[in-house]
From Swiss-Prot:
Free-text function comment from the UniProt entry: Catalytic subunit of the tagatose-1,6-bisphosphate aldolase GatYZ, which catalyzes the reversible aldol condensation of dihydroxyacetone phosphate (DHAP or glycerone-phosphate) with glyceraldehyde 3-phosphate (G3P) to produce tagatose 1,6-bisphosphate (TBP). Requires GatZ subunit for full activity and stability. Is involved in the catabolism of galactitol.
Protein name as it appears in the record: D-tagatose-1,6-bisphosphate aldolase subunit GatY
Gene3D superfamilies noted in UniProt: Aldolase class I (3.20.20.70)
Keywords: Galactitol metabolism, Lyase, Metal-binding, Zinc
SUPFAM superfamilies in alphabetical order: Aldolase
Pathway linked to the protein: Carbohydrate metabolism; D-tagatose 6-phosphate degradation; D-glyceraldehyde 3-phosphate and glycerone phosphate from D-tagatose 6-phosphate: step 2/2
Active-site residue list: D82
UniProt cofactor(s): Zn(2+)
Family annotation (PANTHER family): D-TAGATOSE-1,6-BISPHOSPHATE ALDOLASE, D-TAGATOSE-1,6-BISPHOSPHATE ALDOLASE SUBUNIT GATY-RELATED
GO biological process, one term: galactitol catabolic process
Length: 284
């Protein structure tokens, strides 16, 4: 097994009526949890990293880890650039071996968004790299980028088709009421908008900001065309809270191989639930 593109993963999901979860990882332990759980459940998953994660861990290191784990667990894995904004940064990582990219120019006016995304698509497709882009903008914080709720806006269905055709992207991230981070109360997702987008666009659709969504809402979005579900904050929260609890209860603990186990276990529960919600168990 090897590192693969997400294009075939998402096309399979679109045909099969399920979604592939993209889990944001931050270090060796969080990657281990995702890969081990996915392998045990025979589920397709995407290993996602923001620019901050790639800076923290190193592109070559992350690629080597994903490749090694794909072979160790005999499980196909994709490593994905999440919310990357700079062409040169994306190009360097693609040349290093990354085969799935999200170029996020959603903060730009429509025409400039198209122009920026098309530049990345034209480059990436030369390397058989799949490209995701976003139309509309989610509120909340992702890495060090903060978008106020007042500045967030939903995806326009008619523009979505123009955007997809003009850029040549492989998947489209939509804004239908989710936000980055955890929710203080259940969000009101615009399912009718999503259904309308699906009628205008034949590409696999992507939902960001899925941390904390109910099983019912996730499964409804999948029925309406979502093929990729992004989860980040919920993983971090489970991992960090379990770690804090363990160290509070065991102040004498000094061995990371011991005190990280409870954190991994808590995160594993979240990964397992998301895989179940996505309906992708046994689909790898």
């Amino acid at each position: 097994m090897c590192v693969v593109s997400t294009k075939q993963m998402l096309n399979n999901a679109q045909r099969g009526g399920y979604a592939v979860p993209a889990f944001n990882i931050h270090n060796l332990e969080t990657m281990q949890v995702v890969v081990e759980t996915a392998a045990n459940l025979h589920a397709p998953v995407i290993i996602a990293g923001t620019p901050g994660t790639f800076t923290h861990a190193g592109t070559e290191n992350l690629l080597a880890l994903v490749s090694a784990m794909a072979k160790q667990y005999h499980h196909p894995l994709a490593i994905h650039l999440d919310h990357h904004t700079k062409f040169d940064d994306i190009a360097q990582k693609v040349r290093s071996g990354v085969r799935s990219v999200m170029i996020d120019a959603s903060h730009l006016p429509f025409a400039q968004n198209i122009s920026r995304v098309k530049e990345v698509v034209d480059f990436c497709h030369r390397f058989d790299v799949s490209v995701e882009a976003e139309l509309g903008q989610l509120g909340g914080q992702e890495d060090d980028v903060q978008v106020n709720e007042a500045d967030a806006f939903y995806t326009n269905p008619a523009q979505a088709r123009e955007f997809a055709e003009a850029t040549g992207i492989d998947s489209l991230a939509v804004a239908i009421g989710t936000a980055h981070g955890m929710y203080a109360s259940a969000p009101a997702l615009d399912f009718s908008r999503l259904e309308n987008i699906r009628q205008w666009v034949n590409l696999p659709l992507v939902l960001h900001g899925a941390s904390g969504l109910s099983t019912k809402d996730i499964q409804q979005t999948i029925k309406l065309g979502i093929c990729k579900i992004n989860v980040a904050t919920e993983l971090k929260n489970a991992f960090s809270q379990a770690l804090k609890n363990y160290l509070t209860e065991h102040p004498e603990a000094t061995d990371p191989r011991d005190y990280l186990q409870s954190a991994k276990s808590a995160m594993r529960d979240v990964v397992s639930k998301v895989i179940a919600d996505c309906g992708c168990e046994g689909r790898a």
